């Protein structure tokens, strides 16, 4: 079944054999300043393989996906510390894309750098996600982002279609708080964490952001091939929905990450637009996210 058509219908659980939803590419990089023994490198290689397997082989939902319908995503893990054998600290960059209708183009839906990556992994370990159970921090991080990626993807195809998957991600946050690792609690000084990432998506005040995600992709990106000017107008209109959020919740991680990840795409889409249209768009983006004014100005180049 065509993925776009499927998501516009009421979601109905399927029985029987389940396909997997994600096509995840995993890369692990160790900082040059970190010494890595041959034994440690072997563990890291095994961890990469196990991460790839859990992301791509787990059936995260009850929906069926054809191979070509799987969500393309990337995990880039930057290891900055190895305090003990099999223990790792660093960052994880998570991104996902979705195809534009009637085109080979892929639009970035989610792009986020999580600075609270902490994981332990033993040689020969197998990562296995069990719903409603906390097993270890690494499994929780991976399951959280699997559901968040799926939620964002579904939101881009159907209005608030990702709600069940954001709820799953929120449940993972609640359970993972018992593990004591960073990134899961509202009390942390760094608000760019997993708690706020998913909590925001389920708060009523952020509903305009979810409408923006849908309008930007479904009414904007998906229209560019056949109705380019209408698509561009829909994209600009989608960003206008964000003003009430940023007026009360400035620098919100979800919105800022979304805008930041769309800059190159916007520059390409509006490259042939009138200068006034580009200037209006840039002024809006600067108003929404003043901290990245210089970045948004590149759309005018």
Residue ranges of each PLM-predicted region?
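Sec-exported extracytoplasmic/periplasmic mature domains
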Residues: 52-60, 151-154, 267, 271
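Flexible, glycine-rich surface segments
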Residues: 158-251
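A cross-kingdom marker for long, charged
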Residues: 25-29, 213-301
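Acidic/His-rich structured neighborhood in mature extracellular/periplasmic domains
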Residues: 84-199
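Start-of-domain marker
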Residues: 21-89, 100-102
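Soluble non-cytosolic domains of exported or imported proteins
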Residues: 38-46, 136-141, 253
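Bacterial Sec-dependent N-terminal signal peptides
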Residues: 1-24
């Amino acid at each position: 079944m065509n993925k776009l058509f499927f998501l516009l219908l009421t979601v109905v659980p399927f029985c029987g054999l389940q396909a997997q939803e994600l096509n995840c590419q995993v890369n692990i990089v160790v900082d040059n300043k970190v010494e890595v023994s041959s034994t440690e490198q072997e563990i890291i290689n095994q961890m990469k393989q196990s991460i790839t397997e859990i992301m791509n082989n787990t059936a995260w939902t009850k929906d069926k996906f054809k191979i070509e319908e799987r969500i393309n995503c990337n995990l880039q893990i930057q290891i900055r510390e190895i305090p003990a054998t099999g223990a790792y600290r660093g960052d994880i960059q998570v991104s996902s894309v979705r195809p534009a209708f009637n085109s080979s183009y892929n639009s970035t839906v989610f792009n986020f750098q999580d600075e609270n990556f902490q994981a332990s992994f033993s040689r020969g370990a197998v990562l296995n996600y069990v719903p409603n159970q906390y097993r270890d921090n690494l499994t929780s991080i991976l399951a959280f982002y699997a559901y968040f990626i799926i939620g964002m993807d579904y939101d881009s195809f159907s209005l608030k279609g990702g709600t069940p998957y954001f709820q799953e991600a929120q449940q993972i946050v609640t359970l993972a708080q018992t593990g004591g690792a960073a990134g899961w609690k509202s009390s942390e000084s760094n608000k760019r964490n997993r708690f706020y990432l998913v909590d925001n998506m389920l708060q009523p005040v952020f509903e305009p952001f979810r409408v923006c995600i849908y309008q930007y992709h479904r009414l904007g990106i998906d229209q560019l091939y056949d109705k380019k000017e209408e698509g561009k107008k829909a994209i600009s209109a989608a960003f206008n929905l964000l003003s009430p959020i940023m007026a009360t919740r400035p620098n919100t991680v979800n919105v800022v990450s979304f805008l930041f990840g769309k800059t190159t795409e916007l520059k390409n889409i509006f490259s042939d637009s009138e200068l006034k249209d580009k200037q209006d768009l840039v002024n809006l983006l600067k108003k929404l996210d003043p901290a990245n004014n210089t970045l948004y100005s590149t759309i005018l180049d």
